[in-house]
Amino acid sequence: MKRKYPNLCSPLKIGNVTLRNRMVSAPMAFPDITAEGHVTKEAAAFYELRARGGAAAVTLSECVVHIKTGMSHSRHINLQDEGVLAGLTEAARSIKRHGALANVELSHGGKYAGVDLAKKAGGPAPVRYGPSPETLPNGSKIEEMPKALIREIVEAFGKGAALVKRAGFDMVFVHGGHGWLIHQFFSPASNRRMDEYGCDTVENRARLALEIVDSIRAAVGPGFPIEFRMSGEEHIPGGYTIEDAIRFAKLLGPKIDLLHVSTGAFENSFAITHPSMFAERGCHVHLAAAIKKHVKVPVACIGALNEPEQMEEIIASGKADVVEMARALLADPFLPRKVMLGQDDDIVRCIRCYTCLAERTHTQTRICSINPIIGREYESRFALPPSEPKKVLVAGGGPAGMIAAVTAAQRGHRVTLCEKSAELGGALKCVKVISFKKDLYGLVKNLEAQMRKAGVEIRLNTEVTQERVEREAPDVLVLALGAAPIVPSIPGTDSPKAVLGTGLSEPEVAIGKKVVILGGGLVGCESAVHLAQQGKEVTLVEMMEDIAVEANVRQRPILLDMLAELHVKVKTRTKGVRITDQGLVCTDDSGNETFFEADTVVVSVGQRALREAVKGLLDAAPEVVQVGDCVKPQKVTEALYRGYHAGLDI
């Protein structure tokens, strides 16, 4: 058949293997590793899902080659323990049986290795080593790595590569970027040595990387592909530039089979290496394109890639030979398969909310805001089919209701979804005009398409009442009635100057030049960014001590940076008391009044669950399930998870 994206779907030979297309699953750590650093069946299932989804290669992440000095967290796979062989072998097999190449990342944390985590290696707590002695901002003392230890680590990379080849992996991935050990040696900001590994020349700073690659090549033999990740730029004072990276790449090129160009260092803002929703798609591709002009080895790019049209252009124009994706393949593990089949309208696009990365930090688990399967890949295989099809009525067309309807219909039930308004989307309707939320609003259209494909009957402008339920006589009633915006009990909320935060997407709502937002929660802060990007003068007023407190640990610092960058004025511990024709009157902790002039006051102080509507329907059907904001106002993550499992439980 004629492919819609012929370049993206074309094979590529690297070393003695062939990628079946140009879309590769980049390293993503799965936390379900044993305390001894062994791969579990749950972890193998995590990687297998991407192989089933059509990725050309799937990279198992963060295998540490030197346990005493290299661990940066507690969930590394320990390649110095042959006990990991069985788990690695099963992981490789689970990837390869679906036609993907099994790849594995070899890493060492260098000065950012966690000494407390490495204590389990036995003996006294080891010292942290880097290229040069220094004191980190947190007070940690770093010692210069002695040459004997350098030789030991170089040898460990080779031994680790030999072990994973024995386990059946098709290729290896050397992590030489993002501020880890190899990067530290190449960086003039951290390498101040005066020996042959020292800072005086690019060749000396690259020596460790080249010796590691040579050690791996000696261990795995000719033809076995070596992929090497480097950062195209560091983005830190005194760090290396793209010109230095090009020289580094020219030294590496003849020794490797695929050069993976990322960006950033450990010291950067998290958003540099992991692009946020505020970044352009493909924001790092220019670095790969610049390096590719100077090397003969195939080059892979990465960085907020999930649009097939853009990825096709990258390959067709010669900017890169391979596109790699991480979070995009959490949101939709079947993205490559959908591209191959020309079904790109069905792709669920990553919203770059950082939930996956924040949850790993917070609870050491893996979830995805918009894909309830993530973290449950293994157990999801054993979902029992329903004993008999049931008649299901879903009341509410927000995300929780839609995914409940899709899931139930895909399991064979007869499903009708009724939405009171003229449009699906629920709480997500308010984000459709926000440029950095377009992928989140796209989820509404995707769920609608999934419902139609699954045979869900969709009725708009249809309220679910007791009488309607009696007429329909469903076996199961799913209540997804949503929430309503809270309107504070202050004078002026009915003024033409006042706009509810949920109303920003309405075409008839005009927003003036000077805007005051009452409410500094996540929605209020994101509204402030949106309006400031449109050139509005924005002041954000919050009665509590901090703003955006419900944002996750990865998202919040970046959101605060955006507010500062856009010159949004933030006033905390400030309470709005009345809206006037001129703006918003507030009081501080001492009761002193402050006035903020505004053409428009956006009221964004939260949502209230529609509990009264729920109570009237609790006994309307034999089985009644509640999901989404009508239970309590919640993030899209919780709404989708509850809705998905409600559909699964029927």
Q: Whereabouts are the PLM-identified features?
A:
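Conserved N-terminal glycine-rich FAD pyrophosphate-binding loop of Rossmann-like flavoproteins
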Residues: 188, 422-442, 548-559
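Glycine-rich FAD pyrophosphate-binding loop
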Residues: 413-427, 536-547
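A conserved FAD-binding loop/helix module that cradles the flavin
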Residues: 527, 546-556, 627-650
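Flavin-dependent oxidoreductase catalytic cores
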Residues: 1-395, 399, 403-415, 511
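Rossmann-like NAD(P)H-binding beta-loop-alpha module
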Residues: 397-410, 512-536
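A Rossmann-like FAD-binding core segment of flavoenzymes
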Residues: 441-487, 493-513, 533-616
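Internal hydrophobic alpha-helix adjacent to the cofactor/substrate pocket in enzyme cavities
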Residues: 332, 337-338, 527-541, 639-650
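Residue-level detector of alpha-helix initiation sites
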Residues: 305, 398-400, 423, 485, ...
